């Protein structure tokens, strides 16, 4: 399997598209989270700064559990897709939070979604690639994610600037996360295990 074959492989191209969509949500959320929490809660900046530790801690714990559970069950696709679907719920529900505490809860769900499956995700390309092919494919996947990392924050800022609300940007990022989750489930089951 050469590097050129890897870069033309439909599985690699699908992984690149998935990561592009995922990272739109990942960086859009990460970049704007403090401002979104402040606007939804009305809390002073010092409280917002401390509150950010809560969703990040939740995401860390889920990421550790997700990796452990994936390894134990020898399953990857549903572990990653489930976190993305949880993130979708967080993105879609956050703008409708009736109280600061509920908005923080939905932001926790979003954080779990954008961070929770990341460790398991990066084991997927190496189930069918190795050596230079794996390096080239992972470079392509990561580059497409970097493009998503530009789109997400810029898009959310643009939408907020034109509508005065983060809601529509959160809906778009939720849709991106949902589509990424669906695409994960279309990957072949063989990507659950490393090929010999």
What are these regions (language model features)?
Residues 4-67, 118, 122, 152-153:
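Extracytoplasmic gate region of multi-pass secondary transporters
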Residues 18, 140-144:
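Hydrophobic alpha-helical segments of secondary membrane carriers
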Residues 37-38, 69-71, 155-164:
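Interfacial helix-cap and linker-helix signal at transmembrane-aqueous boundaries
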Residues 47, 133-140:
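Cytoplasmic loop-to-transmembrane helix junctions
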Residues 59, 84-91, 176-180:
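MFS 12-TM fold signature
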Residues 74-124:
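C-terminal transmembrane helical hairpin of 12-TM major facilitator-type secondary transporters
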Residues 125-135:
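Paired intracellular helix-loop junctions of major facilitator superfamily
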Residues 174-196:
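Multi-pass alpha-helical transporter architecture, strongest
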């Amino acid at each position: 399997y050469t590097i050129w074959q890897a870069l033309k492989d439909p599985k690699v191209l699908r992984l690149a598209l998935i990561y592009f969509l995922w990272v739109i949500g990942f960086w859009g959320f990460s970049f704007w989270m403090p401002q979104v929490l402040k606007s939804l809660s009305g809390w002073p900046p010092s409280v917002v700064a401390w509150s950010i530790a809560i969703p990040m801690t939740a995401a860390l714990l889920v990421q550790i559990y997700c990796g452990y559970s994936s390894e134990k069950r020898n399953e990857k696709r549903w572990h990653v897709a489930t976190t993305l679907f949880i993130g979708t719920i967080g993105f879609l529900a956050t703008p409708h939070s009736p109280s600061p505490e509920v908005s923080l809860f939905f932001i926790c769900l979003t954080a779990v979604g954008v961070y929770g499956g990341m460790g398991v995700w990066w084991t997927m390309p190496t189930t069918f690639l190795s050596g230079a092919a794996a390096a080239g494919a992972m470079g392509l996947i990561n580059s497409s994610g970097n493009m998503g990392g530009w789109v997400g924050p810029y898009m959310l800022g643009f939408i907020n600037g034109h509508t005065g609300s983060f809601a529509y940007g959160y809906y778009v990022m939720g849709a991106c996360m949902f589509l990424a989750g669906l695409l994960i489930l279309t990957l072949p089951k063989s990507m659950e295990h490393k090929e010999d």
